[in-house]
Amino acid sequence: MLPRRRLLKALAAAGLLGPAGISGLIRDALAKGDAPIRPGLHKVRGEVIVNRRLATEGQLIKPGDTIVTGANSEAIYVIGQDAFMQRELTTVNFGGEALQNLMRVVSGKILSVFGKGARTIQVSTATIGIRGTGCYIEEENHGAKARTYFCLCYGDVELTPSAAPKEAERYSTTHHDKPMYIHNDMKMPKMMVPADVINHTDDELTLLEALVGRRPPSWGSGSRY
């Protein structure tokens, strides 16, 4: 079971501890320990839209759904073995029945943790094949000016830039070891360039993994992020 103090710290960092005390989401996570909580939307802040309709906490997210967050908004949700923290001004689409392992990040920023099994993430600049990972994505601009920030926080990935498929890389990380920017600009000497760790934390990853009954690989090692 996750130590109460560390889990509460992660939940507070994600803005889930309010003046009313422990929310239903937090009670479920603490009470079940390593057991996953029910699927669906577990935090709705601001304007969150699912399939062109305003979303509510507890709502189920299904294959084929599109989730959109407005300004100063955020959504935390669970789909099967996977959990997501979708930040403001972000649009994400999940593949339908025949493409349940496909996720499209159309715009914005999202932190995700995935269970065992292969998944494919499509972004404006690349196709990202993952397995049992935590990752953070930010999408910027469109067309030739598009740029994607990608941090494989831990796990395995096969990353293929759309503008230069021959530069595809397959690698593994354990703790934010290889963040990068992926470009669409053919004038650049390389489409993938090193980056820093930005805009996501180990506490947020701890929260998401707790919601699906897991722990990040770096758990208890003295987080730097």
Report the location of each language-model feature:
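Flexible, surface-exposed loop/linker segments and immediately adjacent secondary-structure boundaries
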Residues: 7, 11-15, 22-63, 70, ...
